Swiss-Prot record:
UniProt xrefs under SMART domains: CLECT (SM00034)
Keyword Glycoprotein recorded: yes
Topological domains annotated Extracellular: 66-207
Residues annotated with Phosphoserine modification: 7, 16
Domain of life: Eukaryota
Lineage: Eukaryota, Metazoa, Chordata, Craniata, Vertebrata
Protein name, per record: C-type lectin domain family 2 member D11
Entry's localization field: Cell membrane
Matching Pfam families: Lectin_C
Gene expressing this chain: Clec2d11
GO CC, one annotated term: external side of plasma membrane
Side of membrane Cytoplasmic, spans: 1-44
Main location: membrane
Amino acid sequence: MSAKKASQPMLNTTGSLQEGEMGKMFHGKCLRIVSPESPAKLYCCYGVIMVLSVAVVALSVALSVKMTPQISTINTYAACPRNWIGVGNKCFYFSEYASNWTFSQTFCKAQEAELARFDTEEELNFLSRYKGSFDYWIGLHRESSEHPWKWTDNTQYNYSLSIRGVERYAYLNDIGISSARVYADKRWSCSKLNSYSLQCKTPFSPM
């Protein structure tokens, strides 16, 4: 009996040791499954990191495109020569002295221009407003009262504003356009196309 009783604690101790070893083994397996070092877990983590990285890059690109100003190129005309005034694509000159129509046209020719020509209502309004109280020769003439009015380049005058009088040379006054003889002394206005254009880059943000 004593031998049996003595052997029982030893058996219990051995069983406990075996149970402890098995517990450690299962615990280690569980840790390996849960541990981030397992291949499945690592692949999952890498996948999440890649998705987040792509999302961050895409968001950064979208924000940079939205906030970066876009450049729009607009054609504008360069400054006119000194003492000339720019309107649209033309430059206009207003004399401070009076002379006849022929001399006035010769002066404008020397400036690589012609006696003033208007092609739009804006240009006509500008000429009428800027001339003040003085009369100014413009580039309209005709062979006789029976012939149509023409510009200095011989293109026909087609504007709706009529020209008063029966003379051959036109000038701008307070009531519109009138005609006078060639030797009458009046101030004059020259005009020329401004062929020099600049590209002006203006930034704007997309909506």
